[in-house]
Amino acid sequence: MNKPLIRTERNGDWLRFGVKVQPRSSRNQIVGEHEGDLKIKVMAPPVEGAANQALQKFLAELFKLPKKDIRIVRGETSRHKIVEIRGIEAEKLLAFIPQITK
C-alpha cells in the first residue's frame, strides 16, 4: 500500500495539516487522504461546534496528547479545516495513517 500524501508544514512547535471532516458518521475514524488532506469521520453532528470538539478529542486520544495540544486554526464552520498538533512530527503522522486505513 502506498503511503498517503498528506501536506504538512511546521509552525514553530506545531505540525499543521488539512483535514476534511465528515460529521454524523457511525464511528470516529481516519478514512484516508482526500486531495492532500487527512479525511476523518466523526460521530458528532456539525452543530454548535460539536464536530470540532469531537475531532479534537479523537486526535488527542489517537496521538495520546492533551486536547490543548490540538487546535483548529481555520475552518471552524467548514468541513475543510486546518489543524495544528503540538508534540508530533510529520513522520509520525504519516506513518500512523496506513495503520488505520488498511
From Swiss-Prot:
A single Gene Ontology CC term: cytoplasm
Top-level taxon of origin: Bacteria
Family in the record: Belongs to the UPF0235 family.
This protein's name: UPF0235 protein Swol_0959
Species this chain originates from: Syntrophomonas wolfei subsp. wolfei (strain DSM 2245B / Goettingen)
